[in-house]
Amino acid sequence: MRYVILLRGVNVGGVTVKMAELRDLLESLGYDEVRTVLASGNALVTSESTADAVKADVEVALRARFGYPAWVQVLATDALRTIVDAYPFERGRDGWHDYVLFVLDAGVKERILALELDEAHERCADGDGVVYWTVPKGDTLDSELGKASGKAASKPHL
C-alpha cells in the first residue's frame, strides 16, 4: 500500500527535521519507495502494514530520533486523493489560500465548524476527518478560523 505521512509541527517552533534524515529514518523502519516532499514534513512510503501500524511505528521512531512529541497522520494515497477531490470551494482563486485541515479531535472539529465566519472573508466546510477552509492570502493567521486554530486547546489536534 502506498501511504502519505503528514508530520505535524515540524520545521516550526524549534522542531527541525531535515528531510534527508526523515528519509533515512523511514528507510531504516523498512519502508520502501520512500520520498520526502520539500521541507514540509510530508513523506510517501510503501508498506504492507496498516496505516495504524505505520503511524505507531513512525511516531515512536520520530520521538526517539528527534526528541519531540511527534504526531503524524497516515493515509493511503487514494484516501488523500478522495479528500482533495472533495474540496467544496473554488480552487486556485487568485489571492486566496485553499486549505485542508486534518482534525484529530472531534470536539475541536465541532468548535471550528461552529465558528461564525464572514463568508466574504473566509469559509469552512466539513469533510471526512478534515475541515476545508479558504481564506485570502495574508489573512490566514488573523482570520477567525486562523485565530481559533492557533489556540492552545486546538493546536495538538490539527
Show where each model-derived region lies:
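Surface-exposed, charge/polar-rich loops and edge strands
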Residues: 1-40, 44-158
